[in-house]
């Protein structure tokens, strides 16, 4: 098959990483693959192993039209059998390409429970005739879009994210080296990861960690993620006061690590992973932590429950006391018990969420449309 993937950018993010992993797997399975990125090439990107066309679509009307024309030319030359788009901007462009005949079969994928307000939901509904199928990365996301009438139930399915279990495999020497580099000592290290945005609700995590510190002092919190430019904030403290708190003497055990490309190594070095999000789709990093055999404490958002099953702790969103209690419970568990739970988590990923099994599912869906 000839498969074209359309995504907003190749920037460092979970959805982008998932699309690139899928593109690589499809290429390895003998298909011809092309990537179209709406934005221009960025300074920080995931590396692509397949051909990429950058559409350079900025927010001005001229740039948007020029980018759409570039997309039409690229798809016209490539002649795809299937066009698979990811997240709202790319989904709308793919549908436009279907309207003009450049995309014979379009699949749209929704990567979050929340992809915008009422107008976006209406545009999903109005353009649904231009797609063959819509998928969501979690049941929670699919049900919300169906409930809002953005997608009809008969054309919507769930196909979860996949984890590269080869990349995310525990490695003891790597763990020790990173712990030494970052000054972990004998502390229990909690790792959180993701852009510093409203959705991730880091103020909730900081409040929870304060409570953990009141009880167990020999612990650190590492946060890997960049500030997303132009992100909304529901809390006046985010991200400015959050940075101030993290750098103050009161919170000298909170480390802001910035943008990182070495998540397998960071997860190796950590003793547990914590997610404090207010909303999510299907957080890839939780699956990665499970693949690394780490205990996971997470808020009950998006597809978290689908991923974790009974292998981790799930608490209410925006409840720092519950989050702290679950973190403390994980820390108090004997090391042997944590190790056993970690192995069970990895087995769950291997059985249900490996990227290779997901690639096979996608391939089957593509073939069903031909």
Model-derived regions, located:
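Short hydrophobic beta-strand element within catalytic cores of glycosyltransferases
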Residues: 36, 286, 295-298
């Amino acid at each position: 098959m000839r498969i074209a993937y359309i995504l907003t950018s190749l920037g460092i993010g979970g959805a982008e990483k998932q699309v690139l992993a899928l593109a690589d797997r499809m290429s390895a399975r003998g298909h011809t693959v092309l990537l179209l990125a709406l934005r221009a090439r960025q300074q920080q990107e995931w590396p692509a192993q397949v051909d990429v066309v950058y559409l350079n679509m900025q927010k001005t009307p001229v740039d948007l039209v020029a980018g759409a024309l570039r997309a039409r030319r690229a798809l016209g030359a490539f002649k795809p059998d299937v066009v698979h788009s990811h997240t709202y901007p790319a989904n709308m462009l793919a549908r436009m390409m279907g309207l003009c005949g450049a995309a014979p079969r379009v699949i749209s994928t929704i990567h979050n429970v929340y992809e915008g307000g009422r107008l976006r939901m209406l545009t999903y509904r109005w353009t649904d005739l231009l797609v063959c199928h819509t998928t969501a990365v979690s049941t929670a996301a699919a049900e919300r879009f169906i409930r809002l009438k953005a997608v009809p139930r008969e054309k919507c399915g769930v196909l979860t994210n996949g984890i590269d279990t080869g990349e995310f495999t525990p490695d003891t020497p790597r763990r020790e080296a990173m712990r030494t580099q970052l000054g972990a000592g004998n502390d229990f290290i909690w790792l959180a990861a993701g852009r510093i945005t409203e959705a991730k609700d880091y103020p909730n995590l900081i409040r929870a960690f304060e409570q953990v510190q009141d009880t167990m002092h020999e612990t650190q919190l590492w946060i890997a993620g960049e500030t997303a430019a132009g992100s909304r904030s529901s809390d006046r403290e985010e991200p400015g006061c959050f940075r101030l708190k993290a750098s103050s003497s009161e919170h000298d055990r909170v480390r802001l690590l910035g943008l990182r490309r070495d998540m397998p190594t960071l997860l190796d070095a950590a003793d547990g992973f914590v997610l404090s999000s207010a909303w999510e789709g299907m957080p890839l990093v939780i699956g990665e932590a499970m693949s690394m055999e780490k205990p996971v404490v997470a808020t009950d958002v998006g597809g978290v429950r689908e991923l974790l099953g009974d292998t981790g702790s799930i608490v209410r969103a925006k409840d720092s006391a519950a989050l702290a209690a679950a973190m403390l419970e994980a820390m108090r568990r004997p090391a042997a018990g944590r190790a056993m739970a970690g192995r069970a988590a990895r087995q769950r990923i291997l059985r249900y969420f490996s990227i290779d099994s997901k690639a096979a599912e996608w391939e089957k869906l593509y073939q069903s449309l031909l």
